[in-house]
């Protein structure tokens, strides 16, 4: 089998709801059989299941990750923790959620309490809370880091059914923060919260000529910053957000807590670039003329305007469409040099650009296995959407391969819940606490019950 087919598998476009095989969300990988799936109703049932069963154990979460992270052998166990959801406890500064709570429910619950997390959200919120922590899910902004960095307490059921409580400050807490599901089954997470705030997001288009300096400036001067790099046109679309003024905040409340759009005239300066991007995407994805949700991810950049709202309304606006998503975090200090190298490589090779490059920067993470561990980080994100026949643009995949090669050579660390080529990385060299994490794993799961082929290849 070709390497591309292993890294970027084709998609099954048929309905799989009634099949014996259980697929991941993108339907590009069978993770096991439905008869292997267990759905404990509470922690006690989970403990008993672990005591009574044999074989390896993996948690499915929302099944958004590549299949290799989830898949098990016929004798193994798959867990669905969707029954473990909702608020378990709260005090003035924190809220404890069950591990299977979807992020959208977490965000909605906090908003109703007039609270929020210090970490800004990613673009979608269908992930489970525990799954988002385990894979290092993050948003944008140098004053914050991953979702896992807001955890104060993590409750975990171990392979023998016993319970281990991790508290912030414990020597091994940084291992539990981003664990890849390799230590135990998380059942509850306490998140620190802060008072609810509103933001105004200023959107604009700019040349990418000085992106090397501009990206750092945007992130240093604004609480939250996100950018899309349309390399073909040498253009940027930028969202910079800061705390909303009293006037904008009042307008939001007067508008029934809905997003406020500012300005009578929308900015159309990106429209030609958007049309060109849509042409590329249409050629790459419309084999039979079906589907089309992927187009909405860029049509929203047409006729843009500044907006005000809560942090989730502004940034958690993604459209979940099956895709190959590669995201590599590099040291922020090296980012200007890396941008220059991408520009030079593009000028020399003129690769096919399926989608703009997404740029999000975060502060350093305390989690040993976070791609942002110990260093402010710029995440370069790349997307190739599946065609309606389940195929992928070969030119788009070639670009993914080459740009990952470039970023890996610069000390890049891949997002665990997305696609990457493991052969490109020397894990010990890029993760200072790699062996410390392995030692915690040996202590908590000496028989490696929470492993599969993917986890074994990583750590053994």
Q: What positions do the PLM features span?
A:
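Noncatalytic alpha-helical scaffold of FAD-dependent oxidoreductases
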Residues: 1-460
């Amino acid at each position: 089998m070709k390497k591309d087919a292993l890294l970027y598998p084709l998609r099954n476009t048929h309905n799989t709801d009634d099949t014996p095989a259980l697929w991941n969300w993108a339907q590009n990988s069978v993770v096991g059989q439905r008869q292997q799936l267990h759905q404990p109703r509470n922690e006690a049932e989970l403990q008993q299941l672990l005591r009574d069963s044999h074989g390896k154990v993996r948690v499915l979460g929302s099944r958004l990750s590549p299949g290799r992270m989830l898949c098990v052998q016929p004798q193994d166990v798959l867990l669905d923790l969707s029954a473990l959801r909702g608020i378990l406890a709260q005090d003035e500064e924190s809220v404890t959620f069950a591990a299977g709570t979807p992020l959208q429910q977490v965000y909605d619950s906090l908003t109703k309490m007039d609270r929020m997390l210090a970490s800004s959200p990613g673009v979608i919120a269908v992930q489970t809370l525990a799954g988002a922590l385990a894979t290092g899910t993050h948003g944008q902004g140098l004053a914050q880091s991953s979702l896992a960095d807001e955890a104060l307490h993590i409750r975990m059921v171990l392979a023998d059914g016993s319970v281990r409580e991790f508290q912030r400050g414990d020597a091994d807490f940084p291992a539990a923060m981003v664990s890849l599901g390799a230590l135990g089954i998380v059942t509850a997470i306490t998140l620190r919260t802060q008072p609810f705030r509103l933001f105004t997001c200023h959107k604009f288009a700019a040349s990418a000529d000085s992106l090397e300096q501009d990206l750092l400036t945007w992130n240093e001067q604004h609480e939250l910053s996100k950018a899309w790099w349309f390399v073909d046109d040498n253009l940027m679309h930028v969202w910079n957000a800061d705390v909303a003024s009293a006037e904008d905040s009042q307008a939001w409340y007067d508008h029934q807590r809905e997003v406020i759009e500012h300005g009578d005239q929308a900015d159309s300066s990106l429209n030609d670039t958007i049309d060109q991007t849509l042409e590329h995407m249409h050629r790459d994805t419309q084999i039979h003329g079906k589907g089309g949700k992927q187009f909405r991810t860029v049509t929203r950049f047409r006729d843009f305007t500044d907006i005000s709202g809560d942090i989730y309304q502004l940034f958690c606006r993604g459209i979940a469409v099956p895709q190959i998503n590669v995201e590599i975090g590099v040291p922020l200090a090296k980012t200007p040099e890396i941008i220059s190298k991408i520009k030079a490589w593009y000028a020399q090779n003129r690769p096919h650009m399926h989608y703009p490059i997404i740029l999000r920067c975060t502060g350093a993470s305390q989690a040993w296995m976070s791609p942002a561990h110990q260093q402010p980080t710029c995440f370069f994100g790349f997307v190739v959407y599946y065609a309606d026949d389940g195929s992928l643009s070969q030119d788009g995949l070639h670009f993914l391969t080459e740009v990952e090669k470039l970023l890996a050579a610069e000390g890049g660390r891949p997002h665990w819940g997305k696609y990457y080529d493991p052969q490109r990385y020397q894990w010990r060299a890029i993760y200072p606490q790699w062996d410390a994490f392995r030692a915690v794993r040996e202590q908590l799961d000496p028989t490696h019950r929470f492993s599969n082929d993917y986890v074994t290849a990583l750590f053994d």
